């Protein structure tokens, strides 16, 4: 499932994104955020983080720097 999500995001980056003007108000862009989130957290949590990020991408949100959260190690505070 992780590879499938990564394939969808890469397809978007290669074939769809170049056809649109650059409008992402975040850094990293939503597609780069999605790739990193899925690679770091897997399909379910990474997919959820990506969906939350895309829902914030609208004209009324200021945008800015919004990196993927660091993965927490078990047993460490």
From Swiss-Prot:
What GO CC terms are in its UniProt record? plasma membrane
Protein name in the entry: Putative membrane protein insertion efficiency factor
Stated family: Belongs to the UPF0161 family.
Membrane recorded as keyword: yes
Q: Where does it mainly reside?
A: membrane
- Alphabetized HAMAP family for the sequence: UPF0161_YidD
Q: Which domain of life is it from?
A: Bacteria
Which Pfam family is an annotated match for this chain, by its short name?
A: YidD
UniProt subcellular location: Cell membrane
């Amino acid at each position: 499932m992780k590879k499938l999500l990564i394939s969808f995001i890469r397809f978007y980056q290669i074939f769809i994104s170049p056809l649109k003007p650059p409008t992402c108000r975040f850094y990293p862009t939503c597609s780069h955020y999605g790739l990193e989130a899925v690679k770091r957290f897997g399909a379910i949590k990474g997919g959820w983080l990506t969906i939350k990020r895309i829902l914030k991408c609208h004209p009324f949100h200021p945008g800015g720097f919004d990196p993927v959260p660091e993965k927490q190690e078990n047993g460490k505070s």
